[in-house]
Amino acid sequence: MNPAPDEPLVCFGFSGFRVPVTIPESGCHSGWWVRGWLLAVVDWYCHTRNGDEEMLREIVRPERLDLDSPGRRDYWVALEHDSIWGDHLFPLTVFVGPEASEGQGLVAFGSNHGNEYEGPVALKHLVREIRLEDVRGRIILIPVLNPSAFLSGTRESRMDDGVNLNRAFVDGAGRHPALSGITHRIADFVRTHIWPRVHIVLDLHSGGDVARFAICANYHPVDDPLQAAKIEETARWFGTPALMIYQNQTPGLLPSEAERLGKITVGTELGWGRAVNPEGVRYGRQGVLAALINNGLMSGTIEPIAHHKAGTQKRLEMVDRGCFIPAPFAGHYEPLVECGTAVKKGQTVGYLHDFDQFDLPPYACVAALDGVVLAQAWAAPVPKGQHIVVVAKDLDR
């Protein structure tokens, strides 16, 4: 039923939907009370306790995003769902300051993988903390890049196409019929709408269910010495105990593509075990803020923290295949040392047990080089072929 012309129409908004409610002004005295109460509820709901910031995000298709006009905008980006009649929605907040220029800005991603939570939590905090009046350039924050994987709490988009987003940045992603699932379309969205607008890329990861790490910021070796220096400096500002320099042979990586485009690109490993590590959140928040302030995208000052401040960060390189110890059979892993421990070549750093061959001795996981245990399997049960220990070369020894 349509309201009479003289009856006000109030739109209630819940989870991105607006529901029209007609409130008649005529009738008994209680009508006035109900009308006033409902309007008060609407006013309370539509504003946060931190001022007049809108809680409701606009749901838009990618082509309707405004990532260039001055101001702040909060979106749910809608990409068509593969099965239900609807959309995958992921949050995007953009700040554009008065000094923003074409092709310059920072993007920070969380939840490239759906079971890694320090990045999403750190970015969710920053969405609320960053003030528009402090913004000078362009800032794009995407706390949950892969909503399908995040919903299922898995590394891949298990409920949809089963693809790992950090392997989806391949030729034809989102364009070729064979690569048209939601995960490849997210990669295409990043390529089409994000890459042209930023020169700094921060991809916040954790170990998830697979591995526990010595907490680190990480990056690949790049040929351009100026780009390499800027990347290392950006990584140091996270404050983590380690900086991981890792192999760049895996196809389809988001950071690899950003690096090839000449962008200052840094990733992280901020925790493990599908939990939220408070130190990981602290490091993630620090790294994003430092990149913003140090590159003139946001006003303010920032001081080094933790291992960056103390000058104790270690550069750990895991480029050679000898760094990795794969499981020769499915079994249960027993670590003998903690991540971050210095070890010698030939030292046994863990055991792999086969409980089906109960009376056999465990398989010894032996370090192939002098270095530091950078990562180990998180769960005790491991499948055949999984890298259960990574011993990285300490470049600062």
Predicted segments with their positions:
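Structured catalytic-domain cores with a bias toward divalent-metal coordination
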Residues: P8-F12, T22, G27-C28, W32, ...
